[in-house]
Amino acid sequence: MTLGIPDLLVCDTKGKFHFIELKVTVGNVVKLSPNQVAWLTRHGHGSTWIMVRGREDLYLYQGKDAVELRSKGLQLKPYLQLKYPFDWEKLFDLTIN
């Protein structure tokens, strides 16, 4: 196994692969390891995502933003921010369609 590979690998109905790193935070800090940042940055041209569950909201970032997300945390503007109850269909339409 290679260090830094995201938690989820999804294959859509068209055969395209999507990688999603899952994180949980109670503050503004998003803990990404150096290996995770390197992998997400290296493959940022593809469908790579970082999904962060905060206290109340769900934040979605593109993998190519991993370096900035690690340094700025949730202060970095997300690609998508969802309020509870989460609109999972909207999230899936953006990430795997």
Residue ranges and their predicted role:
Residues 1, 13, 97:
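Acidic-basic catalytic patches of nuclease active cores, encompassing PD-(D/E)XK
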Residues 8-10, 15-26:
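Conserved catalytic cores of phosphodiester-cleaving nucleases, focusing on short active-site segments
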